[in-house]
Amino acid sequence: MKNIISCTKGYFLEEIKERLNALGYQLSYQILNAKDYGVPQNRERAFIVGASRFSFDFNLLEPSQSVNIQDAISDLAYLCSNEGAFESDYLNPIQSNYQALMRKDSPKLYNHQATNHSQAALEKLKLINKEQGKECLPKNLHGKQQFKSTWGRLNWNKISPTIDTRFDTPSNGTNSHPELHRSITPREAARIQSFSDNYIFYGNKTSVCKQIGNAVPPLLALALGKAILKSLRK
């Protein structure tokens, strides 16, 4: 979570620092955004690194080239509501360096299954234009959601907002496909989180959504791990 550094006037951070300092660890902390490390998503999280033999410097992390939604998912099969399978073949060629990275070592495509949306949800989605959301709906169809971002479509040329555990629900936020009348699939969400295609998610739909939505993006974790390794070798 991002606000652990500042919430309750820094109480929780101070508790962590005191306890780890007592064990001989030096602490470094910073808020990192996954978009700076090759992840097609605006995702800010607080990271705390404790080390006993060195002081870690977050400036050692190396930023990566920006990746957008088109780079991330345009090669995945265009599914309608309730289409797809747990395991399938790739139907389209690789269209970006990011897709090549995601497909590496994966002979099959997994978890590319679209939610079975209700007819009411499908009718709403049909009213929503590219790059827009709830503002396209008549006020009587807005529902109880207060946030402006609900029923939003992802933009091919931009990064995604933060993926959460309810990305399978169009009314939850900006997590509908840029063109198709459905929310993103678990595999599309996993791509946006930077999980490679050979990482397979098991369990029911709720469990899979939690596994993906609560995760630290692997490419961000990789950048942090490389920076820690640099510190160890100094």
Model-based region annotation:
Residues 1-141:
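Class I S-adenosyl-L-methionine
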